[in-house]
Amino acid sequence: MFKKMKRNVIITIIVLVLISLLLHFYMQTDSYRIYMALCEAKENKKQIKDALCFFERGSERWKAMRYLVMHMPSHTSYVNKGMVQTEIRDIEAISSNYIEKNVNEAYVIWKNCLWKHEVSFEKFCKYILPYKVDREPIVEWRMYFYHKYKHLIDSVAKEEEAYRIIYKYIKKNFKVKHTKSFGELDVLTLDSIQGGNCRERALYMTYVMRALGIAAVMDFTPFWANQGVNGHFWTSMVRSDNITYTISDNGEAYIDGTCEPYKYVVNKNEYLYHVDSLKRIAKVYRYSYDKVRDVSVEVAQNLPDIFRCAYSVDVTPQYRNVTKNNIIPIERKCEDPLYVCTYQQQYGWRPIGRANRVDCGHVDVGPMI
């Protein structure tokens, strides 16, 4: 009797373990993510289901649509209602017609690029297909920018060359200035203004490049490591080998805005210490479309601002001049969260990255520039 009970207990445990493993693996699948997205769509569920069924099952456009939907719950957009700007969840508000057009237009542009062999389907989904970058208002932008800028790169066969041409053109014509605007501006408004802060220029440039089939991303540093209280945004390109590419004369990852021109003639020989006008960067992040981390409302309340975004990813290692093996001794309780910080005159030390414990006495602050 006892042996039979023991055997039944063992069988029950094995069955439960197998069920747990199956559930765990299922929760990592695209089908589960699609199911969860439909659940979160609420009253907009029919629109999302219609979009998922729009393209032929198994086709690349069908897979592209699934990619957009499964990661959509992480994204929100601002909507202007009179003089009030409210934030809504894309999964609860976006129309099937909008995302169907977005997928179709992006796919056709990608397939007709002269450099399409440089852009894999995975790369297309991540860096060309998304209908947005951050939380800006949603508008129909892709074909407008395509027709406006396509003539600049009609005969260009290399993605890097197309990136350079568009980058230089927009940098010359879109003026960076400190402006006060009413909330988040959509990219068509930015197009009519042709001016804004560095974030708005990077946002605009990223949209234009994606409309032309260039795998563009918006990278940023939350704060300069040695100047002021602001950060900086710029547009990079992801090459076919997944290396971050920016314009450079010497082969190194160049970040615009890092050199502040001298206002006066400086004789460096008159100074005891090295003098330059370089703005230095500690960490670089990128707005992805993929969900990078789970950030619930409850968890977000206890996190520094930089870590509240579910789709920003640390890409510091993809830039040149990176220091590695930054392990330092520390005397803190093992359960305490640790952050990498930079110092700002007005605010003191502010978090800019996560630090990972090696053990209770050492911490790895991660790659830094």
Whereabouts are the PLM-identified features?
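N-terminal secretory signal peptides that target proteins for export/translocation
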Residues: 1-3
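Mixed-charge, low-complexity segments
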Residues: 5-66, 70, 262-369
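Compositionally biased, intrinsically disordered low-complexity regions enriched in proline and serine
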Residues: 27, 68, 79, 99, ...
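Hydrophobic/aromatic-rich core segments of domains that either
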Residues: 30, 35, 154-157, 162-164, ...
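Secondary-structure boundary elements
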Residues: 32-34, 46-50, 55-193
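Hydrophobic transmembrane signal anchors and adjacent membrane-proximal interface regions, especially
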Residues: 44, 50-53, 67-70, 77-79, ...
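Short flexible/disordered coil segments
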Residues: 94-100, 240-252, 305-306, 310-318, ...
